[in-house]
Amino acid sequence: MEFNKAQNIIGLRVLNDNVIWLWVKDKSVVVIDPSVHEPVIRYIDENNLHLKAILQTHHHSDHIGGTKPLIERWQNVKVIASSKEKKRIPFQNVSVEDGETLNILGEEVKIIEVLGHTSSHIAFFLNGENPVLFIGDTLFSGGCGRIFEGTYQQMYSSLERIKSLPKDTLIYCAHEYTKSNILWALNLKPKDQDLKNKLSEVEKKLSLNKLTIPFLLDEEMKINLFLRAKNLEEFTFLRANKDLWV
Protein backbone atom coordinates (compact mmCIF):
# COMPACT_ATOMS: atom_id res chain seq x y z
CA MET A 1 0.00 0.00 0.00
CA GLU A 2 1.26 3.47 -0.87
CA PHE A 3 -0.27 6.83 0.03
CA ASN A 4 -0.07 10.11 -1.87
CA LYS A 5 -0.67 12.69 0.84
CA ALA A 6 -1.18 15.66 -1.48
CA GLN A 7 -3.91 13.93 -3.46
CA ASN A 8 -5.37 11.60 -0.79
CA ILE A 9 -4.95 8.70 -3.20
CA ILE A 10 -3.87 5.27 -1.98
CA GLY A 11 -2.44 2.54 -4.19
CA LEU A 12 -3.09 -1.12 -3.39
CA ARG A 13 -0.82 -3.60 -5.18
CA VAL A 14 -2.67 -6.72 -6.29
CA LEU A 15 -2.27 -9.69 -8.63
CA ASN A 16 1.05 -9.66 -10.52
CA ASP A 17 1.35 -5.98 -11.37
CA ASN A 18 -2.06 -4.31 -10.97
CA VAL A 19 -2.61 -1.27 -8.79
CA ILE A 20 -6.06 -0.38 -7.45
CA TRP A 21 -6.36 3.32 -6.64
CA LEU A 22 -8.51 4.54 -3.75
CA TRP A 23 -9.37 8.24 -3.75
CA VAL A 24 -10.22 9.27 -0.21
CA LYS A 25 -11.85 12.48 1.00
CA ASP A 26 -12.91 12.84 4.62
CA LYS A 27 -14.46 9.44 5.31
CA SER A 28 -15.65 8.77 1.76
CA VAL A 29 -13.76 6.70 -0.80
CA VAL A 30 -13.93 6.17 -4.55
CA VAL A 31 -12.28 3.06 -6.00
CA ILE A 32 -10.77 2.99 -9.48
CA ASP A 33 -10.69 -0.28 -11.46
CA PRO A 34 -10.96 -2.84 -8.64
CA SER A 35 -9.46 -6.01 -10.09
CA VAL A 36 -10.11 -7.85 -6.81
CA HIS A 37 -12.22 -7.05 -3.78
CA GLU A 38 -10.56 -8.46 -0.63
CA PRO A 39 -7.82 -5.82 -0.07
CA VAL A 40 -10.27 -3.04 -0.91
CA ILE A 41 -12.79 -4.25 1.68
CA ARG A 42 -10.02 -4.68 4.23
CA TYR A 43 -8.72 -1.13 3.73
CA ILE A 44 -12.20 0.41 3.84
CA ASP A 45 -13.14 -1.48 7.00
CA GLU A 46 -9.85 -0.80 8.80
CA ASN A 47 -10.17 2.92 8.12
CA ASN A 48 -13.92 3.21 8.72
CA LEU A 49 -14.57 4.60 5.24
CA HIS A 50 -17.77 4.76 3.20
CA LEU A 51 -17.62 3.50 -0.40
CA LYS A 52 -19.33 6.07 -2.62
CA ALA A 53 -18.40 5.15 -6.17
CA ILE A 54 -16.40 2.85 -8.44
CA LEU A 55 -14.82 4.28 -11.59
CA GLN A 56 -14.33 1.81 -14.44
CA THR A 57 -11.97 2.76 -17.27
CA HIS A 58 -12.72 -0.36 -19.34
CA HIS A 59 -14.16 -3.85 -19.18
CA HIS A 60 -11.11 -6.13 -18.86
CA SER A 61 -11.41 -8.65 -16.04
CA ASP A 62 -8.34 -7.37 -14.19
CA HIS A 63 -10.15 -4.03 -13.85
CA ILE A 64 -13.69 -5.09 -12.98
CA GLY A 65 -13.12 -8.41 -11.19
CA GLY A 66 -13.73 -6.96 -7.73
CA THR A 67 -16.66 -4.71 -8.56
CA LYS A 68 -19.57 -7.12 -8.10
CA PRO A 69 -18.52 -8.24 -4.58
CA LEU A 70 -18.03 -4.59 -3.59
CA ILE A 71 -21.50 -3.49 -4.65
CA GLU A 72 -22.96 -6.56 -2.96
CA ARG A 73 -21.22 -5.52 0.28
CA TRP A 74 -22.25 -1.84 0.11
CA GLN A 75 -25.54 -0.46 -1.19
CA ASN A 76 -26.13 2.70 -3.23
CA VAL A 77 -22.63 2.66 -4.72
CA LYS A 78 -22.33 4.43 -8.07
CA VAL A 79 -20.59 2.31 -10.71
CA ILE A 80 -19.49 4.78 -13.37
CA ALA A 81 -18.52 3.49 -16.82
CA SER A 82 -18.78 4.31 -20.51
CA SER A 83 -22.26 4.07 -22.00
CA LYS A 84 -20.63 1.90 -24.68
CA GLU A 85 -19.78 -0.69 -22.00
CA LYS A 86 -23.32 -1.50 -20.85
CA LYS A 87 -23.12 -5.09 -22.07
CA ARG A 88 -19.57 -5.71 -20.88
CA ILE A 89 -19.92 -3.88 -17.55
CA PRO A 90 -23.56 -4.80 -16.86
CA PHE A 91 -23.51 -3.66 -13.23
CA GLN A 92 -22.81 -0.02 -14.14
CA ASN A 93 -25.54 2.32 -12.94
CA VAL A 94 -24.08 5.63 -14.14
CA SER A 95 -23.33 5.63 -17.87
CA VAL A 96 -21.15 8.45 -19.19
CA GLU A 97 -20.12 9.97 -22.52
CA ASP A 98 -16.96 11.64 -23.75
CA GLY A 99 -16.74 15.23 -22.49
CA GLU A 100 -19.33 14.77 -19.75
CA THR A 101 -18.58 16.30 -16.35
CA LEU A 102 -19.55 14.75 -13.02
CA ASN A 103 -19.32 15.90 -9.43
CA ILE A 104 -17.55 13.25 -7.38
CA LEU A 105 -16.54 13.83 -3.75
CA GLY A 106 -17.15 17.54 -4.36
CA GLU A 107 -14.68 17.64 -7.26
CA GLU A 108 -15.32 18.23 -10.95
CA VAL A 109 -14.42 15.09 -12.91
CA LYS A 110 -14.34 15.16 -16.71
CA ILE A 111 -14.76 12.04 -18.84
CA ILE A 112 -12.15 11.71 -21.60
CA GLU A 113 -12.56 9.00 -24.20
CA VAL A 114 -9.16 7.39 -24.89
CA LEU A 115 -9.72 4.67 -27.45
CA GLY A 116 -7.18 2.17 -28.71
CA HIS A 117 -6.57 -0.38 -25.97
CA THR A 118 -10.29 -1.11 -26.21
CA SER A 119 -13.05 0.38 -28.33
CA SER A 120 -14.67 2.14 -25.37
CA HIS A 121 -11.87 3.02 -22.91
CA ILE A 122 -12.33 6.19 -20.86
CA ALA A 123 -10.24 8.20 -18.42
CA PHE A 124 -11.30 10.33 -15.45
CA PHE A 125 -9.74 13.81 -15.20
CA LEU A 126 -9.79 15.93 -12.04
CA ASN A 127 -8.91 19.44 -13.17
CA GLY A 128 -8.32 21.07 -9.80
CA GLU A 129 -5.38 22.80 -8.15
CA ASN A 130 -3.49 19.50 -8.40
CA PRO A 131 -4.74 17.89 -11.66
CA VAL A 132 -5.15 14.11 -11.64
CA LEU A 133 -5.83 11.65 -14.45
CA PHE A 134 -6.96 8.06 -13.85
CA ILE A 135 -5.92 6.58 -17.18
CA GLY A 136 -6.42 2.80 -16.83
CA ASP A 137 -4.42 0.98 -19.52
CA THR A 138 -4.05 3.72 -22.14
CA LEU A 139 -0.76 5.16 -20.87
CA PHE A 140 1.95 3.71 -18.64
CA SER A 141 5.18 5.28 -17.50
CA GLY A 142 7.49 4.64 -20.43
CA GLY A 143 4.79 2.88 -22.43
CA CYS A 144 1.21 2.70 -23.63
CA GLY A 145 -1.48 0.03 -23.77
CA ARG A 146 -1.55 -2.74 -26.32
CA ILE A 147 -4.08 -2.25 -29.08
CA PHE A 148 -6.65 -5.02 -28.65
CA GLU A 149 -9.87 -3.61 -30.12
CA GLY A 150 -9.00 -0.19 -31.46
CA THR A 151 -6.62 1.08 -34.13
CA TYR A 152 -3.18 2.66 -34.17
CA GLN A 153 -4.82 5.92 -35.19
CA GLN A 154 -7.17 5.81 -32.21
CA MET A 155 -4.38 5.15 -29.73
CA TYR A 156 -2.17 7.85 -31.25
CA SER A 157 -5.07 10.32 -31.06
CA SER A 158 -5.73 9.32 -27.45
CA LEU A 159 -2.12 10.02 -26.51
CA GLU A 160 -2.33 13.39 -28.26
CA ARG A 161 -5.38 14.21 -26.11
CA ILE A 162 -3.44 13.33 -22.99
CA LYS A 163 -0.52 15.52 -24.08
CA SER A 164 -2.89 18.50 -24.30
CA LEU A 165 -3.70 18.33 -20.57
CA PRO A 166 -1.96 20.57 -18.01
CA LYS A 167 1.68 19.56 -17.76
CA ASP A 168 1.46 19.23 -13.96
CA THR A 169 -1.20 16.51 -14.27
CA LEU A 170 -0.39 13.52 -12.08
CA ILE A 171 -1.22 10.35 -13.99
CA TYR A 172 -2.41 7.17 -12.27
CA CYS A 173 -2.21 4.11 -14.52
CA ALA A 174 -3.33 0.63 -13.50
CA HIS A 175 -0.12 -1.41 -13.87
CA GLU A 176 3.47 -1.30 -12.60
CA TYR A 177 5.25 -1.77 -15.92
CA THR A 178 7.78 1.05 -15.73
CA LYS A 179 11.09 -0.81 -15.57
CA SER A 180 10.26 -3.11 -18.47
CA ASN A 181 9.08 -0.15 -20.53
CA ILE A 182 12.26 1.85 -19.89
CA LEU A 183 14.47 -1.13 -20.72
CA TRP A 184 12.63 -1.50 -24.03
CA ALA A 185 13.06 2.20 -24.79
CA LEU A 186 16.78 2.03 -23.98
CA ASN A 187 17.11 -0.87 -26.37
CA LEU A 188 16.01 1.54 -29.12
CA LYS A 189 17.69 4.67 -27.71
CA PRO A 190 20.76 3.39 -25.78
CA LYS A 191 22.39 6.83 -25.54
CA ASP A 192 19.31 8.71 -24.32
CA GLN A 193 20.34 10.34 -21.04
CA ASP A 194 16.78 11.04 -19.91
CA LEU A 195 16.01 7.33 -20.20
CA LYS A 196 19.19 6.38 -18.36
CA ASN A 197 18.30 8.75 -15.54
CA LYS A 198 14.76 7.38 -15.43
CA LEU A 199 16.01 3.80 -15.17
CA SER A 200 18.22 4.72 -12.20
CA GLU A 201 15.28 6.44 -10.50
CA VAL A 202 12.98 3.47 -11.15
CA GLU A 203 15.48 0.89 -9.90
CA LYS A 204 16.01 2.88 -6.71
CA LYS A 205 12.26 3.03 -6.00
CA LEU A 206 11.78 -0.65 -6.73
CA SER A 207 14.70 -1.58 -4.47
CA LEU A 208 12.84 0.20 -1.65
CA ASN A 209 9.64 -1.69 -2.56
CA LYS A 210 7.98 1.55 -3.72
CA LEU A 211 5.71 2.08 -6.70
CA THR A 212 7.10 4.01 -9.66
CA ILE A 213 3.63 5.41 -10.38
CA PRO A 214 1.89 7.87 -10.48
CA PHE A 215 3.94 10.11 -12.76
CA LEU A 216 3.84 13.73 -13.95
CA LEU A 217 2.80 14.37 -17.54
CA ASP A 218 5.58 16.93 -18.04
CA GLU A 219 8.27 14.46 -17.03
CA GLU A 220 6.66 11.60 -18.93
CA MET A 221 6.74 13.54 -22.18
CA LYS A 222 10.53 13.58 -21.93
CA ILE A 223 11.02 9.82 -21.54
CA ASN A 224 8.02 8.11 -23.13
CA LEU A 225 8.81 7.23 -26.75
CA PHE A 226 5.11 6.94 -27.60
CA LEU A 227 4.47 10.49 -26.39
CA ARG A 228 7.57 11.65 -28.24
CA ALA A 229 6.38 10.15 -31.55
CA LYS A 230 6.08 12.94 -34.11
CA ASN A 231 3.45 11.28 -36.28
CA LEU A 232 1.24 8.22 -36.69
CA GLU A 233 3.86 6.38 -38.75
CA GLU A 234 6.47 6.68 -36.00
CA PHE A 235 3.96 5.68 -33.34
CA THR A 236 2.89 2.63 -35.35
CA PHE A 237 6.50 1.49 -35.70
CA LEU A 238 7.09 1.87 -31.94
CA ARG A 239 3.90 0.04 -30.94
CA ALA A 240 4.61 -2.85 -33.31
CA ASN A 241 8.18 -3.04 -32.01
CA LYS A 242 7.02 -3.04 -28.38
CA ASP A 243 4.57 -5.87 -29.12
CA LEU A 244 7.56 -8.07 -29.99
CA TRP A 245 9.57 -7.10 -26.89
CA VAL A 246 10.17 -9.94 -24.42
Curated annotation (Swiss-Prot):
UniProt GO MF annotations: hydroxyacylglutathione hydrolase activity; metal ion binding
Chain sites annotated for binding Zn(2+) 1: H58, H60, H117, D137
EC number(s) reported in the record: 3.1.2.6
SUPFAM superfamilies in the cross-refs: Metallo-hydrolase/oxidoreductase
Annotated residues for binding of Zn(2+) 2: D62, H63, D137, H175
SMART domains registered for this protein in UniProt: Lactamase_B
Cofactors, names only: Zn(2+)
InterPro entries: Clx_II_MBL, Glyoxalase_II_hydrolase, HAGH_C, Hydroxyacylglutathione_Hdrlase, Metallo-B-lactamas, RibonucZ/Hydroxyglut_hydro
Pathway assigned in UniProt: Secondary metabolite metabolism; methylglyoxal degradation; (R)-lactate from methylglyoxal: step 2/2
Function: Thiolesterase that catalyzes the hydrolysis of S-D-lactoyl-glutathione to form glutathione and D-lactic acid.
Subunit-structure text: Monomer.
HAMAP family tied to this protein: Glyoxalase_2
UniProt family annotation: Belongs to the metallo-beta-lactamase superfamily. Glyoxalase II family.
UniProt-recorded name of the protein: Hydroxyacylglutathione hydrolase
Gene: gloB
